Regions:
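Phosphate/nucleotide-binding beta-alpha loop and adjacent structural elements of enzyme active sites
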Residues: 1-261
Length: 261
């Protein structure tokens, strides 16, 4: 893939040899069924969708509102010769149809947002008028059937993306929802997902060395735990994994916990 070393996030991809968000990489490589559709919402450079295409042979829909980053995703798809199985939608997923302002973070290339408060003191970047719509509208021609993974990273607009799913927020439609929720959206997002029939898991707080050791065990076929059930009394900050309650993935994660002791 193309890497711009002037970008903080892409520089991280370069120096870690692509090992960016390793727990999410494990979800993609080990939990997404082979050939299942993947939606990478808030794609940035497209790294997660590209991993899904490479390791799971997944057809991928990339959603990226920033014009420069959307073009980067297109080039990365073309560099791999995957134009026939991947598409890029240059728009923002939301809960309503219309136009919006995308605020560019001048310092952090992964923190552009529809929320000016999210960008905060780094509001020195440009502003773009962009198209926004619920995901079912943006992907209206997506073949009906299960989506193996919906990854949402909308920089403070994640709850609106969830709300905009409508009938798509269904365990029969979505196999995995991977989303970052912050502030009051944690409580609202949890309630929305649980009402729809999903159960949540949060990332274990691990030091990098310990995380790498557990990943080596998992990729070697040994049991280890990267994600723990979200307790009823609290909702973690940051990235969370949601799967159909009582489904195969939930049982698999529970079995890993049991075997790992």
């Amino acid at each position: 893939m193309e890497v711009d070393l002037a970008s903080e996030i892409q520089q991280t991809l370069f120096w870690t040899d692509g090992d960016y968000e390793p727990q999410l990489h494990w979800v993609v490589r080990e939990l997404v069924p082979t050939g299942a559709q993947v939606v990478d919402c808030g794609a940035n450079t497209g790294i997660i969708g590209l991993v899904a295409r490479r390791f799971r042979s997944s057809p991928v829909s990339f959603i990226e509102p920033h014009p420069r980053l959307a073009e980067t995703v297109r080039r990365n798809v073309a560099l791999n010769g995957w134009e026939s199985s991947c598409r890029v939608v240059e728009a923002a997923a939301s809960d309503t149809v219309g136009e919006a302002v995308l605020y560019e973070n001048a310092e952090e290339d992964g923190a552009h947002s529809l929320d000016s408060g999210w960008v905060g003191g780094q509001l020195g970047g440009r502003q773009f008028r962009i198209r926004k719509a619920p995901l079912p509208d943006l992907l209206g021609d997506l073949p009906h059937g299960p989506i193996g993974l919906l990854k949402i990273d909308a920089e403070g607009h994640d709850y609106e993306v969830l709300e905009g799913l409508g009938d798509w927020l269904d365990p029969d439609r979505l196999g995995i929802v991977y989303v970052e929720l912050g502030g009051e959206d944690r409580t609202r997002g949890r309630a929305l997902l649980e009402r729809a029939g999903f159960t949540g898991f949060g990332q274990r707080p691990l030091r990098p060395r310990r995380q790498r050791a557990l990943l080596r065990r998992l990729y070697a076929g040994e049991p280890a735990v990267l994600f723990e059930p979200i307790p009823p009394s609290s909702m973690p900050e940051g990235e969370t994994l949601w799967v159909p309650a009582g489904g195969a993935i939930a049982r698999h994660l529970g079995q890993l916990r049991h075997l790992a002791g």
